[in-house]
Amino acid sequence: MTINVGVLAPKSSWHFRDLKRASESFGDLKVCSVDFASLSAAVGLGSCERFHDSSQAIDKLDALVVRTMPFGSLQQIIFRMDVLHRIRDAGVQIFNPPRSVEIAIDKYLSLSLMAANAIPIPPFAVVQTVSQAVATFEKLGGDVVLKPIFGSMGKNIHRLTDEKAARDRFEEFVANGEVLYLQKFIDHDGSDVRVLIIGSETFAMRRVNEAGGWLTNVAQGSKAESYTPTQSEIDLARSAAQTNHCEIAGVDLVYPCDAVEPLVLEVNASPGWQAIQNVCERDVAKSVLQFIAATMAG
């Protein structure tokens, strides 16, 4: 019996093409692209609720991989997540489950849950007004990282060390309708560790800012290096992934200069693997599909 797997990613994207390539070694697994932006639901027009994108019936798939979550309005994002929940209720297996995507995409919820489960994270606060942000800036030592509460790849992240410059940035965020996620800056050696978890498998890389800066995202120009994680790093990453209800997760760890144990910076429920696959020389896409096939087989 063929397993039909939909991937929420454009056909032109590297990750979809890599999954398509890997699927060719499976005789009983087919991969197709699903368009997040055209997902639709129809109720009362047949015997049951039906789900489509612009080209196919989604409820006819066996599994769905959430590879990307495109930006959109509040209505669009809520509807897309609601549809994922209903597609899952209709019997389509979703990787990662919708609830894990909801948790991990929200830095406040994700990190507060990890803190509640004794997972070490940087001190942070989330506020809604400029005056609260200025007070928090001072409480966190006058050296903070301001991030979008929903965001990825190091975009729109600012390190703030001057109160006037910080206030100006806070006013900009508030004017744009954003809440203010303020994390205490963690001094480190310009590198961090990404641990990629796919079921029982683990992959890892070290990301290095060769220019000596503090941002380590590969998307922002840092270099990926091969890395063998310690068992304690793997255990910490797995605990973080489980707290976020993730079966597939990218977990970022950073070592403060004044500590020997790492902190969890964040958990990504739809992690990319292009950089990590290049440096670890393992077929990550094949592992993703093997995990899906094994899960579907029970």
Mark where each language-model region is.
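ATP-grasp fold ATP-binding core
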Residues: 114-115, 137-156, 177-188
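Conserved N-proximal alpha/beta basic substrate-recognition cap immediately N-terminal to
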Residues: 10-123
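Rossmann-like NAD(P)H-binding beta-loop-alpha module
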Residues: 117-141
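Extreme N-terminal starter segment of soluble prokaryotic enzymes
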Residues: 1-6
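Glycine-rich phosphate/pyrophosphate-binding beta-alpha loops
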Residues: 268-281
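Short glycine-rich anion-binding loops that position phosphate/pyrophosphate groups of nucleotides
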Residues: 69-71, 150-151, 270
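Phosphate-binding site of ATP-dependent enzymes
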Residues: 155-244
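A long amphipathic alpha-helix within ATP-dependent nucleotide-binding catalytic cores
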Residues: 215-262, 286-298
